[in-house]
Amino acid sequence: MSTSEVSPAQRVHRLRDRLGGLGFGGDYNPEQWDDATRAEDLRLMREAGVTLVNLAVFGWGRVEPARDAYDFRYFDTVMDDLAAHGIAADLATMTASPPAWLATEHPEMLPVTADGTVLSPGGRQHFCPSSPVYRDRAVKLAEALAAHYADHPALAMWHVGNEYGIHVAECFCDVSAADFRRWLADRYGSVDKLNDAWSTDFWSQRYTGFAQILPPRVAPTYPNPAQQLDFKRFSNDALLTCFRLERDALRRITPDVPVTTNFLAGHKTVDWYAWAPEMDVAALDSYPDPHGPHEHIAAAIAYDALRGATGGAPWLLTEQAPSAVNWRARNAGKAPGRMRLWSWQAVAQGADAVMYFQWRQSRGGAEKFHSGMVPHAGADSRVYREVRALGRELARVPELAGTESSNDVAVLFDWNAWWALELDSHPSDAVRALERLFDHYAPLFDLGVGVDVVHPSADLTGYRLVVLPSLYLLSEDHAARIADFVAAGGTLLASFFTGIVDEHDRVHLGGYPGPLRDVLGIRVEEFWPAADGEPVPLRAAPGGPEPAEPGSLWREDVGLAGAVPELLFTGPDWDDRPAATVHAHGRGTARYVATRPDPAAMRDLTRRALADAGVDPVLPGLPPGVQAVVRRGDGYDVLIVLNHTEEPVTVTLPAERRDLLAADRPLVAGLTLEPRGVAVLGTTGMAADR
């Protein structure tokens, strides 16, 4: 069967049928252990309900100990054992960490930093993404693996690379420089168009030929910001090319096997919105910090962003920690019940698999203190008992696999805007993309509203409220789409430093926020960022919410051009200047926030925007800290309620539902959730028992 005859949806459907419900498992690294331990692993996996493992992520050195000398015997045994125990393999192409012999034979493939430092092997990801040597050897290995395991009964999915770009996202070597020049020539066509896009007449940076252009290496002062931005785009594309080359090799030989790779939440190096459409199913590694009081909200943002990147399709949680990680300054374990809670949160927000790094905690190596499903203490441990209980629980709700969510609120996010916002030479380096995203997402989460985090090019017609969290880079085309959305009756909530530059980091002239001025009914002349720790005093305008605390981070000189103020700045030089505004545009409403209000005030402003849009919470009347999400199937839906607090809570349902985690799935009209508790509630028409 040719690749063109099998669609991504068909590949994923086959995977879902193979797993029989939600996937459960983790990274399996049997090469670290002896035969007796491997035998125990298989027994414990069956006991815990493991259905899927990520296999051989770092196996290149074992299967190709010398050039073209492939030796699959070890993993043949492992694959045979997995198949015999009914466990599917997400088999890695093993290309995340090239073997020592390859780096020794081809030192030119090693990555180079902006200051010219060559990064040595000894860690992982020690390759230049543009290296023809690396790409050639990676594709050859992928082809050899596909040919060898094409018909193996354990093979369920291919896992290409691993967490692309988290250690080496950019390479500044001469090979990358030549590849960058080719990329620029394809993008711009002529050096004159590049000069215009990069504003090279500033500081006499004009080029007369592409051969003169280098990556933004260390320079006497700030490199050209448009050059930096394009180099980030190029670097993203170079890594994506590596993925595509391996994916295409796999599909030529195993066209019906789905292909994925895994993102790492919180990293800005690869653009999820560009990568996810290239995969059959997207995957994410998520490591919330148990020390953080709002980590469940940060995780929720990542899950909604990945679902936005997939167009609403389910995704796979390929890694999380059973308890502690090893790479923070202070590595807290997860309190009893938290691993279960955070796993179900991922499922609620679209995950069709719950997996961990890793199955058995390593005895040696850099990650030996990263927890495992089977920890150093062995199976007689709290962590393993919680893992086993969760595996059995997930197996009770196979109907969740393949279900999707739909929401009325879209938060717009763009990796290009993230990259551009955090370049140098801005009014304030304290304005950070993820923090601004959190500031807008958190009140929506607190108010119980479902959210999609989508790219500005997404179709907005199905949404009622669109949020722009300091979306610094905004093209004229995307701005026009937003304006049309509001004019047609939608509600917009935008915050400061939005719509400032175009896709080439050139300022939209005529006053800020550029192409959104008319929609918002304002015109900003100047930015006045606050100093570190400096309060920004605020008060309510007539009819506006009264802030309990000062704002922070930012203020700007907002001129009204049809908008009405809701918050006002106070204090010397700022008394009664607008700090938050509302404006009627067409049949819709556009709101603007010119500072960072305290969380309560931001929640009040968000509540007003939701009222304008007619958006209700998923489950009205929820106590603070309780999350509710609905996943919808064919003729049924499942409501998942998560108690992120340390207190028991009582939840009343608007109609009876089936408690899908309880024996015989009884009907319930309400429930009490223990601290860190979870409820999974189906519609009454679902089967009464499993």
Each language-model region and where it sits:
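Conserved, mostly hydrophobic/aromatic
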Residues: 26, 45, 53, 82, ...
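Aromatic-lined substrate-binding rim segments of carbohydrate-active enzymes
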Residues: 40-46, 54-118, 246-253
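Carbohydrate-binding surfaces of carbohydrate-active enzymes
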Residues: 210-213, 265, 276, 287-690
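Short, acidic/polar
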Residues: 33-47, 138-144, 264-275, 335-343
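N-terminal carbohydrate-binding accessory modules
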Residues: 1-54, 65, 80-81, 88, ...
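Short, well-ordered coil/turn segments that N-cap beta-strands
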Residues: 20-22, 49-51, 83-89, 151-156, ...
